[in-house]
Curated annotation (Swiss-Prot):
Family to which this protein belongs: Belongs to the ClpX chaperone family.
Any one of the GO CC terms: HslUV protease complex
InterPro entries per UniProt: AAA+_ATPase, ATP-dep_Clp_protease_ClpX, ATPase_AAA_core, Clp_ATPase_C, Clp_protease_ATP-bd_su_ClpX, ClpX_bact, P-loop_NTPase, Znf_CppX_C4
SMART domains given in the database record: AAA, ClpB_D2-small, zf-C4_ClpX
Binding site for Zn(2+): C16, C19, C38, C41
KW Lyase (keyword) present: no
Lineage: Bacteria, Pseudomonadati, Pseudomonadota, Gammaproteobacteria, Alteromonadales
One Pfam short name: ClpB_D2-small
GO MF terms, alphabetically ordered: ATP binding; ATP hydrolysis activity; ATP-dependent protein folding chaperone; protein dimerization activity; unfolded protein binding; zinc ion binding
One Gene Ontology biological process: proteolysis involved in protein catabolic process
Residue ranges annotated for the ClpX-type ZB domain, each copy included: 4-57
Ligand binding (ATP): P121, T122, G123, S124, G125, K126, T127, L128
Name of protein: ATP-dependent Clp protease ATP-binding subunit ClpX
Amino acid sequence: MTDIKSGGDNGKLLYCSFCGKSQHEVRKLIAGPSVFVCDECVELCNDIIREEISEISPKESKEALPSPIEIRESLDEYVIGQDHAKKVLAVAVYNHYKRLRNGDNHNGIELGKSNILLIGPTGSGKTLLAQTLARLLDVPFTMADATTLTEAGYVGEDVENIIQKLLQKCDYDVEKAQRGIVYIDEIDKISRKSDNPSITRDVSGEGVQQALLKLIEGTVASVPPQGGRKHPQQEFLQVDTSKILFICGGAFAGLDKVVEQRNHTGTGIGFGAEVRGKDQEISLTDRLADVEPQDLVKYGLIPEFIGRLPVLATLRELDEAALIQILQEPKNALTKQFTALFDMENVELEFRSDALHAIARKAMDRKTGARGLRSIVEAVLLDTMYELPSMENVSKIVVDENTIKGESKPIVIYDSKQEQAASE
């Protein structure tokens, strides 16, 4: 075989026998017995061969699966509190990936799938726990909002779009997607609107639960490649959802009353009712910790759907002390993030202890949990972050309780040495 760089012996223009490009359109043209191939076609053939080989012998991950204790310790670095929920998640996730590594069938015993239901107030850390798990295990992760889902054929988002989003996260690598984690938020919002069957179809409530059943339990979903629309002549990607871990989360507002009603059935009403003192009041967290499947059915989830989420974890309502910890202790704590932002301007940022308490109290008053902390700090530091890049000789910004309450602006401390040098 020879490399052709110019015209043939008779000056005739030569073309690639595969793609038809002339020798002037490519870098190299290789000649064989009465055929020619260009460098671009050679590269394309190499890609095809590499892809075929990788499909025949996929690389198995040899990395050791972290133990439940190691998973819990990693969660502790990013999520404050919620000890019971972390333990439940660590065991469920470990068992799920152990099942994937060793096969669904062990010594003739078929191993079931353990999807997870997280119940907890807004801002208690449900989404953060799921995100942190995916990052720790280095698997694809996607989130879906249950309120946008509808049954197939109705206006809204089809449940199979969830799998499409997961594929997008890993460049449509099906094998990788099948080891991923899907978090479905606001799952309580698709509860059945009524205990009684209705003649009108509930396409965003019970209908979505029915549509999610097979997906969560395990089915082979047909997903159009690269996000295209479905049409009959199209080739679909086949994704086995039995290997995907589904975590569903919701605040379940009002579920505590369902639990309380079950626990105090028959205590009487009116003069016969049981009267409890203030010290006997049960907290929201303690009531939710006592949730049973029958309570979820009464709330509006269908029994079949609850059966597909066998692992239940309840998250505690965050108190002031926990919110202060969240502000300071995790690896990506909010105060650390803002300190880093100010450090880029060569300015030190200090949050005094009374400021942290004031931020936590404000978040509790708003009932936004940890989710509301950032908006409070952003609002307080807005003017400072706006003016700081144009200011000179600033060495430190101090935020105290009065700043959080809106009674004063952050304290600005100037570099005295630079000021003295400027005055001289």
